[in-house]
Amino acid sequence: MIPGEIIAASGDIELNAGAPTVTLEVSNTGDRPVQVGSHYHFAETNAGLSFDRAAAHGKRLDIPSGTAVRFEPGQTRSVTLIPLSGRREVYGFRQLVMGKL
């Protein structure tokens, strides 16, 4: 072993195993691209994105940590969301929650 080396287990690693999911259609109605990161509270994303925000409340994208999804102007795509975990408190973003979910 080399100091700092990471030896991953063999096989596939399932992300967010067992987490309940919601799939939503999202459209970028704006004139600029919008990029949403993996742990952003999806209900508070850019107002130019059109989707069921109530269904997205308390949820984030079901994608690997540190990655993002980009919505080009006029583009519609499906995204899968999972519940935010941990203490389930949201602060910042667009300041629509600022506390417990």
UniProtKB/Swiss-Prot annotation:
NCBIfam families: PRK13203.1, urease_beta
Organism expressing this protein natively: Rhizobium etli (strain ATCC 51251 / DSM 11541 / JCM 21823 / NBRC 15573 / CFN 42)
Taxonomic placement: Bacteria, Pseudomonadati, Pseudomonadota, Alphaproteobacteria, Hyphomicrobiales
Domain of life: Bacteria
Alphabetical UniProt keywords: Cytoplasm, Hydrolase
The EC number(s) this enzyme carries: 3.5.1.5
HAMAP family linked: Urease_beta
GO MF entries: urease activity
Protein name: Urease subunit beta
Reactions catalysed according to its record: urea + 2 H2O + H(+) = hydrogencarbonate + 2 NH4(+)
